[in-house]
Amino acid sequence: MKINVHAGHNPDGKTACGAIGLIKESTENRKVKNEVISLLKTLGHTVYDCTEDNGKSKSDVLKKIVTKCNAHKVDLDVSIHFNAGGGRGTEVLIYGTNSGAYTYAKNTADAISTLGFVNRGVKNRPDLYVLKNTNAPAMLIESCFVDSAEDVNRYNYKTMAPAIVKGITGQTINNTPVQSNSIYKVQVGAFSKKENADALAKELNAKGYKTVIVSESK
């Protein structure tokens, strides 16, 4: 797939930054965005980061994001946000039920809810600038609520991002360590005189290293 991904809003501390509660939206959505992009690229997808960090106003941020998104021909635009206002859980916003993003949105909400978040489902928001003006189908993910202690205690960008990626692609990354039958040895020195080898072995033993002296023919 070819996918645009961006974190909504300016960074924290600037005009038009995101919601602030127990955590800060503009900090966390950038963490999630970076991890999502990394995972998607690992899975072989083409990804463009369309985040805007220097908008002069809310409308300027939105316009610049859409301009960046529309510069690429992609299958999907993904906008990462966090919610606020006293609720709990995750929801994904799209332009309308007939949007090409609907299935991605539903799968993403379902995937995030497996982390323990309330599933608020997919909601139509044709009034939102990004959803209305991107060329490709777009979805806006409200990951969880920044002002909900329950959500914040459950949230971790390292688990949120893989859930989003699974919702988009249906793919997961296997983090199970690969078993190896190989043994790796480290050689420190080689000497023609045994007393030199003995001296180095004694020094290493004193430092806590286990040593073995091996004799080989020249």
Feature-to-residue mapping (PLM):
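Periplasmic OmpA-like peptidoglycan-binding domain that tethers envelope proteins to the cell wall
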Residues: 20-27, 194-196
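Envelope-exposed proteins and targeting segments
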Residues: 1, 88, 137, 182-184
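Short, flexible active-site loop motifs that bind/organize anionic cofactors or intermediates
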Residues: 19, 78, 186-187
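Short glycine-rich His-centered loop
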Residues: 1-22
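Solvent-exposed beta-strand motifs enriched in subsets of small alpha/beta binding domains
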Residues: 8, 177-218
